[in-house]
């Protein structure tokens, strides 16, 4: 229903079930329920028009498919959920820990290599009642599994999307990919990819101050962006984007010419997306 009309849902103990707001402004309620449990819906005193849709989703799941949503109540132990990646891709996971009165959910990704499961990232912490917590990986073709550990009082909604990424990047300065003014480029690093990559921009006017927006979306590590002016060996700027910082701004000098941007990983575990915008 419409949020402004304040539809409320209560469980069998008459405790209010908390709602999350969907992208289109509707209210969505979710809670782990026992078979035969009764819920109560309180309608507003004044009603214009309200649509109420109810449904039951099975608790617990095994393997995963892209764009499907799964629900699982915590067991106190780690549960594993296999999935496959067919092409080099940016893979974005969304985990929502629904019960605000519960505790933290933990998650990480493992890859199957030579018959053994190998962990490829740091642990992600999903706080209670934190909806739409996203974390992104750069993954190659292969078999993977999502590991989740949640308290028995927590209910998690889990989904992922996958977007294939071309490996057509420049590993040499002489082959640097050009970024046009008011344009941007993005790609991924996987755990096995180590070589630095090169991009370039052209500053054609000294009247306006130009900037580079340097961004990342990773679970582990981060990226180093080193900026050079054509003809100069010494870098004019070095910027690291890591930790909680999703992006940093590099202010460019008011000097005409070609400038090169070299991007490199900060750690072996670094995997995920990066973005360079020129404005």
Regions found by a protein language model. Name each.
Residues 36, 67, 88, 129, ...:
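Beta-strand-connecting loops/turns
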Residues 16-26, 119-129, 235-244:
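Solvent-exposed serine/threonine-rich low-complexity stretches and specific carbohydrate-binding patches
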Residues 1-2, 39-43, 51-52, 82-100, ...:
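Hydrophobic beta-strand segments within beta-rich accessory/binding domains
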């Amino acid at each position: 229903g419409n949020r402004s009309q304040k539809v409320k849902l209560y469980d069998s103990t008459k405790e209010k079930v908390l709602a999350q707001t969907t992208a289109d402004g509707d209210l969505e309620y979710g809670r782990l329920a026992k078979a035969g449990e009764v819920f109560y819906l309180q309608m507003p005193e004044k009603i214009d028009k309200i649509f109420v849709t109810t449904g039951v989703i099975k608790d617990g799941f095994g393997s995963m498919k892209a764009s499907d949503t799964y629900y699982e109540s915590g067991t106190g132990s780690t549960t594993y959920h296999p999935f496959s990646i067919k092409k080099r891709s940016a893979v974005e996971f969304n985990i929502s820990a629904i019960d605000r009165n519960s505790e933290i959910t933990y998650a990480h990704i493992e890859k199957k290599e030579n018959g053994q499961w190998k962990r490829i990232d740091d642990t992600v912490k999903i706080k209670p009642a934190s909806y739409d917590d996203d974390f992104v990986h750069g993954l190659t073709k292969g078999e993977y599994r999502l590991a989740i550990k949640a308290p028995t009082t927590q209910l998690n909604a889990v989904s992922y999307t996958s977007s294939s990424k071309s490996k057509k990047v420049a590993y040499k300065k002489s082959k640097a990919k050009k970024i046009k003014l008011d344009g941007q480029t993005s790609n991924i690093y996987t755990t096995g990819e180590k070589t630095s990559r090169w991009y370039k921009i052209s500053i054609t006017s000294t009247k306006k101050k130009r900037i580079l927006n340097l961004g990342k979306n990773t679970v582990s590590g981060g990226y180093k962006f080193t900026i050079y002016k054509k003809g100069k060996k010494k870098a004019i700027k070095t910027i690291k984007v890591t930790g909680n910082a999703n992006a940093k701004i590099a202010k460019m000098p008011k000097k005409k010419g070609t400038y090169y941007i070299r991007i490199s990983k900060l750690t072996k575990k670094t995997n995920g997306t990066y973005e360079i915008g020129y404005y």
